[in-house]
């Protein structure tokens, strides 16, 4: 945390999202105000990441160092990227669900400069997907995105 402050804060935070809605290894149940810390990874997160370890869950670390949700929220801009059907429920909760520690990514609903980039497969459970597409297609030029 001190190193982040000494560097002037975080300008751009680029995130993925887990199938259970975790971001930055802040698993479900993480405090929405949490700071950078060592975390124990859930079995689901370890299963999701086994592909990077020869599909061997036993080779996946059980702990990690992560920025907390409060730390992430202090970033000036946040971009979250999600692709594929396996992320559809998490994206639905992130965008349309209530803010809850059970779906840590939902805290991003309160970020003033958060952008969510998803493909059609990840968008498949969004109830307002057509509205989101329409508003993006007709956004004012001054928005610059």
Predicted feature locations:
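Conserved phosphate- and dinucleotide-binding cores of soluble alpha/beta proteins
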Residues: 1-145
């Amino acid at each position: 945390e001190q190193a982040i402050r000494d560097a002037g804060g975080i300008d751009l935070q680029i995130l993925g999202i887990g199938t259970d809605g975790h971001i930055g290894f802040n698993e479900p149940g993480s405090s929405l105000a949490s700071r950078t810390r060592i975390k124990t990874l859930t079995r689901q997160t370890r299963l999701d990441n086994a592909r990077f370890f020869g599909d061997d869950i036993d080779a996946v670390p059980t702990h990690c160092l992560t920025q907390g949700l409060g730390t992430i929220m202090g970033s000036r801009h946040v971009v979250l990227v999600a692709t594929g059907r396996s992320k559809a429920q998490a994206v639905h909760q992130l965008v349309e669900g209530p803010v809850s520690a059970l779906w840590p990514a939902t805290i991003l609903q309160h970020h003033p400069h958060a952008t969510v980039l998803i493909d059609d497969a990840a968008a498949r459970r969004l109830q307002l997907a057509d509205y989101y597409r329409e508003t993006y297609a007709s956004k004012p030029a001054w928005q610059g995105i």
